[in-house]
């Protein structure tokens, strides 16, 4: 389906932060939208993996394309992953346990942020 995989997804309840790791294949484009106003776009990714770190929604804490993983830590916000064929839009919320989900809207799939280790899309 896609060359994007997600693992080590967990919710740190004390910090109200969702952290996960994403791998990207060369040539993919990435759009990060933390708060619908702050957007970072990376097109034509030449490295197998690019790394981004967010301390909160929409705030870029660091960018190092030479590392071996891409980690995102943010509060409530959106993450859109654009690859060759499919556009994914994930929504994570920390409002309550029942709302603490990721929605893969284009496929209508829903995953719980608390139990989503080693997912592959």
From Swiss-Prot:
Superkingdom: Eukaryota
Note: Partially overlaps HIP1.
Protein name per its UniProtKB record: Putative uncharacterized protein YGR190C
Species assigned in the record: Saccharomyces cerevisiae (strain ATCC 204508 / S288c) (Baker's yeast)
């Amino acid at each position: 389906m896609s060359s994007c995989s997600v693992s080590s997804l967990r919710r740190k309840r004390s910090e109200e932060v969702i952290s996960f790791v994403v791998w990207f294949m060369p040539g993919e484009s990435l759009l990060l939208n933390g708060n619908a106003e702050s957007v970072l776009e990376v097109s034509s990714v030449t490295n197998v993996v690019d790394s981004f770190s967010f301390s909160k929604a929409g705030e870029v804490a660091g960018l190092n394309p030479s590392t071996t993983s891409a980690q995102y830590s943010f509060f409530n916000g959106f993450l859109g992953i654009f690859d060759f064929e499919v556009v994914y839009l994930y929504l994570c919320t920390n409002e309550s346990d029942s709302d603490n989900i990721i929605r893969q809207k284009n496929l209508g799939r829903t995953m719980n942020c608390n139990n989503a280790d080693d997912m592959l899309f």
